[in-house]
Amino acid sequence: MKRTFQPSVLKRNRSHGFRARMATKNGRQVLARRRAKGRARLTVSK
């Protein structure tokens, strides 16, 4: 049986990267929450 997690940096960044978050209103809310919480990393992208 094939494992469900098949890592790809490109897919990861397109779904969860900084620019993907900034592209939508809700994504920007995610970043705002994470900034307010004091997260060291806002998104998975470098």
Swiss-Prot record:
The cross-references to PROSITE patterns, in alphabetical order and at most eight, read: RIBOSOMAL_L34
UniProt keyword Ribonucleoprotein present? yes
Molecular function terms from GO: structural constituent of ribosome
Name the domain of life.
Bacteria
Name any one Pfam family assigned in the record: Ribosomal_L34
Listed GO CC annotations: cytoplasm; cytosolic large ribosomal subunit
Q: Which UniProt keywords apply?
A: Ribonucleoprotein, Ribosomal protein
Q: Name one GO biological process term.
A: cytoplasmic translation
Q: How does it assemble?
A: Part of the 50S ribosomal subunit.
Query: Could you say which protein family the record assigns here?
Result: Belongs to the bacterial ribosomal protein bL34 family.
Give the protein name, as stated in the record: Large ribosomal subunit protein bL34
What gene, per UniProt, encodes this protein? rpmH
